Amino acid sequence: MAADLDFFFDPVCPWAWITSRWVVNVSEQRNYEIEWRFISLWMLNENNTREWYTPQYRAGPYLGHQGLRIGDAIRLGEDDPTAVGRWYTAIGEALHVGAQREAARGDAVSWYRGLLVGAGLDEGYLDAADDESHDEYIRADTELALSRTGKDVGTPILTFHPGSDNEASFFGPVISKAPRGAEAVELWDAVEKLATMSGMAEIKRSNRIAPDFT
C-alpha cells in the first residue's frame, strides 16, 4: 500500500523532530500512512569547508548518519512498516526531549544499543552504525528528496501524495512547537493546500524562537 506522505528526516535535526511529532499527531486523527525516509545532513555537508564546520561540529551530523544506517538495517530486517518510525521516535525522545546529546556523542555505540533495546528492536542492528554498505541507499534517498525540492534546503522534506498526479514536496514546515488536536489538523490542511497549489514556490521567514519539545 502506498504511503500518503513521505517524510525525509535526519534524527539529529531538532526542527525535523518537532515537525514529525505534528505529522504523527495528524496521522492519528486522519488515519493516513507515513513512510519514514532518510536525508543525511552528514552527506549534505561532506564537502563543507567553512570555518564553523569543525570536527567537533561534524560529530553531530555523523551521529545522525549512524542512526540512519541503523534505520536502514531496520528497514531491511523488519516486516513491520512502522519499525523505522519507531526507531526515529526512540532517537528523538532521547536526543531532543531527553536532552541526551552529550551522552550520545560521548559513546554513540552504547547509546544506540540502549535505544534499540528500549524500542524492542534487535540489538544486532547496532552493527550497521559503522557499516558503509548502507550509505548507497541513504544517499539515494537524500538525492531523491532534493530532486523533489531543489538543493538549497535541509530537513525535514515532506512529499504529499507520493506517486500520484498531485504529488507535491517542500522543505518544512519549520515550527518551534508541535501543535496538537484540532490546531494540528488546521495547520496540516493549510500546509497541504499551499504545497499542492500550482505555481507555489516558497513562503519563509528567518526569525525563529527556540525549539520547544514539550
Predicted regions and their residues:
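A short alpha-helix capping/helix-coil boundary motif
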Residues: A2-A3, T89-E93, F170-F171
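Residue-level signal for beta-strand positions within conserved beta-sheet cores that form or flank
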Residues: M1, R30-Y32, N166
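Charge-dense, low-complexity intrinsically disordered segments
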Residues: D10-C13, Y57, P61, E78, ...
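Structural alpha/beta surface segment adjacent to cysteine/selenocysteine redox centers
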Residues: W17-A108, Y112, A190, L194, ...
